[in-house]
């Protein structure tokens, strides 16, 4: 199974990806995480350091693929998760999609691409041009990381459009949204009412999730010394279980930009109407409970 993880820049894709990878590994799956970001820091939480990129390795070998060995580019991370960083072209030059293609090509040359139960592509930001949408060409499922905010959901809608486009050529599905570090989900619910798609999990606003990134550790590793964090790991294990079960997923029909802008901005501009609706729903629920 191949997964592509997208979301607004800074939303916590890499932290979420690393923890999902460990959760999948703990469920007995052999996992490879491929970082698809020129910053090459996707797997930092798994390895604790910035591993050399495939592009750097290929350049050092003058692009002689036959001179590259698996141990040159694949690094073992926490929980037995194997890690690769694609890297990227110099700033302002080249195409990230080309880099992803070269990464997949090399892994196939090394007979490594088919050795894993699950390959997870962690893709930079919400830039879904043809280049950085390239991982969707290889993926069975796309996951979108979001929060309960306007910008993240607007980005999610654009990513959903990319999924729909790529699904024309192969059996790609959107597995669903993962809410990251948010105490509320009312705006998420408002969005999925407009653009139906599953929500796999919503992680609460837990400071340790953010801190784990700085420490270069997954929540699972941190929980080894702080058992109070074990409950946080359960969120990621729940996501892993849903993915292992191969969800049906959806081919989303994204909202038009203006329609979505109006829908989401109304939530902020007219909070009273939203509060009134919420209160009415609660009163109805109370009556039903009686």
UniProtKB/Swiss-Prot annotation:
* The EC number(s) this enzyme carries: 1.3.7.7
Which cysteine-cysteine pairs are annotated as disulfide bonds in the entry? none
Q: Which InterPro entries match?
A: NifH/chlL_CS, NifH/frxC, P-loop_NTPase, Protochlorophyllide_ATP-bd
Q: Where does Mg(2+) bind?
A: 14
Q: What class of enzyme is it?
A: oxidoreductase
The cofactor remark states: Binds 1 [4Fe-4S] cluster per dimer.
Annotated GO biological process: light-independent chlorophyll biosynthetic process; photosynthesis, dark reaction
- Binding of [4Fe-4S] cluster, residues: 95, 129
Protein family membership: Belongs to the NifH/BchL/ChlL family.
UniProt xrefs under PANTHER family: LIGHT-INDEPENDENT PROTOCHLOROPHYLLIDE REDUCTASE IRON-SULFUR ATP-BINDING PROTEIN (PTHR42864:SF2)
The entry's protein name is: Light-independent protochlorophyllide reductase iron-sulfur ATP-binding protein
Recorded source organism is: Porphyra purpurea (Red seaweed)
